[in-house]
């Protein structure tokens, strides 16, 4: 069997309510938060040898970061715990050993036969299913986190003694401009993928009404002991095709009550209006608990958020730039947050795009200025959403909360191609470019195996410069003599002549100032912001003494 389809092996959980329930005891063991975090965390690591590879190979490795990197935060552990409780709690009222499951199946059979959702044969058949509403902006990591958590469970468990294929979870997506009936069809489709069955052909393609479809879903869900039904992207549902928000709410409430299995609904803030009345209600009539999945915050209660610091510090280590800064500065971290607003997808992709830009430019270093430039050039599609988040106005946030960003993924691919198109120069190619004539290059090729380029090239250039009329055949003995004598040609070439003064200071172009160390005044100037003076930046870096605080300390 595959990793998602296993034979049942039963373990006592230690929880009395779960004892002797095969659907619960066949699940993976209950985990502490620390172990849960370890099981969710990605194993992506980079080595020093990765750093020495060609730019093309490094670019491909960098582009794997959005898919392979995952750092569990507090919200992930909360969601993991809620899912664990929902799955196991939902099975408490459907224990096949106590007859509870059979009661649900008999009630489901009655509903299918009569076509009425309120019909039952066993009134005392109780439901222990819980429901959950997960709301968050597009790119905040809801779906990625869910996939990570669900991947810690096998999807299908076969119970030989019961002859039952238990489906632990099922995830379906709402299509754009979809209808409520499409949710039912997607349910049968997803179940067929998990089990290799043909429920869609048997039930989905017939002209059943919504009530009949829900009755069929209920019966099949209980027949396969479905542990959790996840419906993602509910903001895509068409209100006009679904009869309006109230009709949609009624559908989801009925689905939770009738199917009798835990249901999780996921969407952006646009979907919140469907459940607004229920969320405002003190009684919570529909029973939807809610998690609002906000972007990670930069500060908490006026202090730096340690989760944001830990997340960015760990991500910063996944650099394949040869001139990278070992430690992430507060300045770069602050700019990173300002641009991304803590939206996880943007945080990671801004980092990846900045690395690719640094590779393409050849400076191989991420700076605050580079992050700003990449944000302006590459992330235009999500500027409205991020500006709405900066405003803090709920109406604006809801309007732009479901912006998708396929353009960013396209840019990742394009930057990979751009880097691949840049010709990687070998040391030999670079050396040949430094020499002026074919004769000089011929001499270099003859001697390059025996002498270091840093000495060989200036020696050849000096020989041709001092003897412009001699052929390379005649200059060869002279070059060899100088090389064997170990004459310090480089230092002589750098000596200023009488007729021409040569500055001993190497001039760095202003366009290259952002590649200097971050303590260099020129680097600090290159990272200036319009709203801050140079004096304020120097003061922030600790270059200028704060006289007021100094006098205060002196008393």
Curated annotation (Swiss-Prot):
CDD domains: AAA. Residues 495-555 are annotated as: Interaction with TnsA. The gene is tnsC. It comes from Escherichia coli. The keyword Nucleotide-binding applies. This is Transposon Tn7 transposition protein TnsC. ATP binds at residues 136-143. Pfam families: AAA_22 (PF13401), Tn7_TnsC_Int (PF11426). One of its GO terms (biological process) is DNA recombination.
């Amino acid at each position: 069997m595959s990793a998602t389809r296993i034979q049942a092996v039963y373990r006592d959980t230690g929880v009395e309510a779960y004892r002797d329930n095969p659907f619960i005891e066949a699940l993976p063991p209950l985990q502490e938060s620390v172990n849960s975090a370890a099981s969710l965390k990605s194993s992506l690591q980079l080595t020093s040898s990765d750093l020495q590879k060609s730019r093309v190979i490094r670019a491909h490795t960098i582009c794997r970061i959005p898919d392979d990197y995952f750092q569990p935060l507090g919200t992930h552990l909360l969601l993991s715990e809620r899912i664990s409780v929902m799955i196991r709690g939902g099975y408490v009222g459907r224990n096949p050993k106590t007859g509870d499951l059979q009661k649900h199946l008999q009630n489901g059979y009655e509903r299918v036969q009569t076509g009425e959702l309120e019909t039952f044969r066993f009134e005392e058949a109780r439901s222990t299913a819980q429901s959950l509403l997960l709301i968050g902006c597009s790119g905040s990591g809801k779906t990625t986190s869910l996939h990570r958590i669900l991947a810690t469970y096998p999807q299908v468990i076969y119970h030989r003694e019961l002859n039952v294929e238990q489906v632990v979870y099922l995830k379906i997506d709402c299509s754009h401009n979809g209808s409520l009936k499409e949710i039912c069809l997607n349910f049968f489709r997803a179940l067929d993928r998990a089990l290799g069955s043909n429920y869609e052909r048997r039930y989905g393609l017939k002209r059943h009404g919504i009530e009949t479809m829900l009755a069929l879903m209920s019966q099949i869900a209980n027949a396969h002991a479905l542990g959790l039904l996840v419906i993602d992207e509910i903001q895509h549902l068409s209100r006009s095709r679904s009869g309006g928000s109230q009709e949609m709410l009624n559908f989801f409430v009925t689905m939770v009550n009738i199917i009798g299995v835990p249901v999780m609904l996921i969407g952006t803030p646009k979907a919140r209006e469907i459940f607004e009345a229920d969320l405002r209600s003190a009684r919570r009539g529909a029973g939807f608990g809610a998690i609002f999945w906000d972007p990670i915050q930069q500060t908490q209660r006026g202090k730096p958020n340690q989760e944001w610091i830990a997340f960015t510090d760990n991500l910063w280590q996944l650099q394949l730039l040869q001139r990278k800064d070992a430690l992430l500065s507060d300045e770069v971290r602050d700019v990173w947050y300002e641009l991304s607003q803590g939206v996880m997808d943007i945080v990671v992709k801004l980092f990846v795009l900045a690395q690719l830009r640094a590779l393409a430019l050849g400076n191989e270093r991420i700076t605050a200025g580079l992050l700003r430039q990449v944000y302006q050039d590459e992330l235009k599609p999500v500027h409205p959403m991020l500006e709405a988040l900066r405003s803090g106005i709920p109406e604006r946030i809801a309007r732009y909360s479901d912006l998708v960003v396929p353009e960013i993924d396209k840019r990742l691919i394009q930057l990979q191609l751009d880097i691949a198109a840049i010709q990687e120069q070998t040391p030999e190619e670079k050396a040949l470019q430094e020499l002026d004539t074919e004769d000089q290059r011929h001499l270099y090729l003859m001697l390059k195996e025996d002498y270091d380029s840093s000495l060989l090239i200036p020696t050849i250039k000096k020989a041709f410069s001092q003897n412009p009329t001699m052929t390379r055949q005649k200059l060869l003995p002279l070059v060899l003599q100088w090389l064997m004598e170990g004459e310090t040609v480089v230092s002589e070439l750098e000596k200023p002549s009488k007729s021409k003064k040569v500055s001993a200071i190497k001039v760095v172009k202003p366009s290259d100032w952002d590649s200097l160390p971050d303590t260099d005044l020129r680097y600090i100037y290159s990272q200036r912001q319009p709203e801050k003076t140079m004096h304020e930046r120097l003061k922030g870096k600790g270059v200028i003494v704060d006289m007021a605080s100094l006098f205060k300390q002196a008393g």
